[in-house]
Each structure stands twice: as C-alpha cells, then as structure tokens.
C-alpha cells in the first residue's frame, strides 16, 4: 500500500517529497507524544483519556495499515507500528481505570473488555471492507479522515460530559492537533504536486472533513480552557470555605 510515496510520482512531486516526508515524521512524533502522554496521564490520574469508540476505530485502522496493508516506506511503517504498540497501553489504562468513570452505567462498567473487543472487531472489519471496496490506498486516507473526526468529536463530547479535565491536558490536545495538521500539509503537497493521483483530495467531502475537524478541535481547546478555569474557581472557593 502506497500512502505517501510511490515510484510513479511525477518529477514535480519528487522535488518536494522530502518536505512531505518531514511532515509524515511530524505526524508520528505528534501522535506518539499524544499516546505516551495519555498513558502517563491515565496512570497518574487513574482514568483514561481517549473516548472508547474513537480508540477502537483508531487502533483498528493502525492494525489494518500497519500490519495487513503495510506501507512500502520504512519510516511510515515505523510510525504506524510505534503508534499501534503504544496504543495498546492506552487501551490497557482504559480497561483498568474505565470502570470508575462508568459507575452511572453498570452495563458499561462491568463489560469494558468485551466492549473494546467488539468495538475493535467492528471497526477492523469496517476498514477492511472499505479497502476491499475502493482499494487500500484510498481507504487508507478516507479511513484516517473518519478516525480523526470520530476522535475529535469523541474527545470534545467526553470533555463536556465529564465536566472535568481529568485524563486530558493542553499537551495532549496540542500534540494531537499538530500531528493531524502535519497530515494536512503532506496531503496538500500531494494534491498540489501530484494531481494525477491525488486530485480527489480537493473534493467537497474531504474539504468538509477538514473544516469540521478544525472547528471541533478548535472548540476543544476553548472548552478545555473554560472547564479548567471552572475547576480552578471551584477549588479556590473550596479552599476559602475551609479556612
């Protein structure tokens, strides 16, 4: 599966291919920082940071394009496998500490391992079906866009429904945002300099996905700021009452 490079690339793209490669590495760095930070924050706060369904979708995508349809580019393959490995730690912390976040829903609280197993299996078959329908190279990109939207919406909903920043931080938000934004830059370079293969990146649905992601992830930063400020105010008021 060719994700970001191919022997068929025109000369115009080959001149800027190294820039696209740098942003692919930037994507990997951003997401690895995010995953490691998520595991660390989960262990420290005894909670989990990524919403359940986005986590299942994300790890299923990494399995498909890290193991089943691996990239022909070594560094890209390394990014995916590194992310997959660390993501297993994210799932571990979610299963270990998730029950206390779901005391209001016993069915979820007592069945998190089963929910994760079924969720990953469901998204895994979905990604494979998409690859069979439109080909692995296209499905790789469309699947990534879906994962990103689901992750952004899930993260925002989790922050709002919890009314708390536990399991989250500015570092996690920014590393996720910068990692995903690196993908946007590399995709733009392919669209600009390799239109024969990537002109579809300028289609309305892709542009809508990009706009929706920017709005949702931008909103996450704003909501995080206000939730954090509320937590500080409540903590300050509590401190004054105990004096």
Swiss-Prot record:
The protein depicted here goes by the name Terpene cyclase atmB
InterPro entries, per database record: PaxB-like
Q: Which GO terms describe its cellular component?
A: membrane
Q: Tell whether Lyase is among the UniProt keywords.
A: yes
Q: Could you tell me which Pfam families the record lists for this protein? A: Pyr4-TMTC (PF25129)
Please classify the protein's predominant subcellular localization into one broad category.
Answer: membrane
Q: Name one GO molecular function term.
A: lyase activity
Its organism's taxonomic lineage begins at: Eukaryota, Fungi, Dikarya, Ascomycota, Pezizomycotina
Say if the entry is tagged with keyword DNA-binding: no
Subcellular location, in the record's words? Answer: Membrane
- Give the family this protein belongs to, as stated in its UniProt record: Belongs to the paxB family.
Gene symbol of the encoding locus: atmB
* Species: Aspergillus flavus
How does this chain sit within the bilayer?
Multi-pass membrane protein
**Superkingdom of source:** Eukaryota
Q: Per the UniProt record, which EC number(s) apply here? A: 4.2.3.-
Induction is noted as:
The onset of expression occurs at 48-hour-old stationary cultures and the steady-state levels correlates with the onset of aflatrem biosynthesis at 108 hours. Expression is regulated by nsdC.
Where is the chain membrane-spanning?
19-39, 48-68, 78-98, 112-132, 134-154, 169-189, 205-225
Task: Specify the enzyme's EC class, one word.
Answer: lyase
């Amino acid at each position: 599966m060719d994700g970001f490079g191919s022997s068929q690339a025109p000369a115009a793209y080959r001149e800027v291919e190294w820039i696209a490669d740098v942003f692919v590495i930037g994507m990997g760095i951003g997401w690895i920082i995010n995953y490691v930070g998520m595991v660390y924050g989960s262990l420290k706060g005894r909670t989990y940071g990524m919403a359940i369904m986005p986590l299942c979708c994300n790890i299923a995508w990494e399995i498909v394009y890290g193991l089943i349809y691996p990239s022909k580019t070594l560094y890209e393959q390394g990014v995916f496998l590194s992310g997959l490995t660390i993501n297993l730690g994210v799932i571990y912390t979610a299963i270990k500490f998730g029950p206390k976040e779901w005391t209001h829903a016993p069915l979820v609280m007592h069945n998190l391992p089963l929910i994760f197993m079924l969720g990953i299996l469901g998204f895994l078959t979905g990604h494979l079906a998409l690859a069979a329908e439109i080909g692995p190279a296209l499905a790789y990109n469309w699947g990534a866009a879906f994962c990103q939207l689901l992750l952004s919406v899930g993260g925002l909903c989790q922050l709002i429904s919890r009314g708390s920043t536990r399991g989250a931080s500015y570092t996690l938000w920014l590393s996720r945002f910068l990692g995903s934004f690196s993908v946007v830059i590399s995709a733009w370079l392919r669209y600009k300099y390799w239109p024969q293969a990537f002109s579809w990146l300028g289609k309305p649905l892709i542009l809508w996905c990009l706009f929706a992601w920017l709005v949702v992830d931008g909103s996450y930063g704003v909501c995080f700021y206000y939730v954090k400020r509320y937590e500080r105010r409540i903590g300050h008021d509590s401190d004054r009452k105990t004096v």
